[in-house]
Amino acid sequence: MLIPKRTKYRKQHRPVRRGMSKGGNEIAFGDFGIQALAPAYVTNRQIEAARIAMTRYIKRGGRVWITIFPDRPLTKKPLGTRMGSGKGTPEFWIANVHPGRVMFEIGGVSEDVAREALRRAIDKLPMKCRVIAREGGDI
């Protein structure tokens, strides 16, 4: 699973979810990609589930690139705990994804295989997404 090797601080503030993506809006490595249409926190487990769904479908052909990284810890207090007494412990790591961000890319496979593999990965993600091609248009 994707987690940072080390961080300067154990806990961070929650990231802002509004606004459009400032960079990473175009396909950089592969031929097809998944672009976010809504803001969301994507956990390291969701990224891994999407990666497995894609790689299992394309089998040995092609290559997958993950262009987001879960670098923010999200804290949670235990169930049944009263309010107060400090911030909770880090539960999981998230990537803050803004609309327009390309999260996964795939290359080296046919368009039909790429479309189906990316559709399976989209089912694992918590927000609305679309499949885009390197030319810039929808598939």
Swiss-Prot record:
Residues 1-21 are annotated as: Disordered. Residues 1-20 have a biased composition (Basic residues). CDD domains: Ribosomal_L16_L10e. InterPro entries: Ribosomal_uL16 (IPR047873), Ribosomal_uL16_bact-type (IPR000114), Ribosomal_uL16_CS (IPR020798), Ribosomal_uL16_dom (IPR016180), Ribosomal_uL16_sf (IPR036920). GO terms for molecular function: rRNA binding; structural constituent of ribosome; tRNA binding. Keywords: Ribonucleoprotein, Ribosomal protein, RNA-binding, rRNA-binding, tRNA-binding. The keyword 4Fe-4S does not apply. Part of the 50S ribosomal subunit. This is Large ribosomal subunit protein uL16.
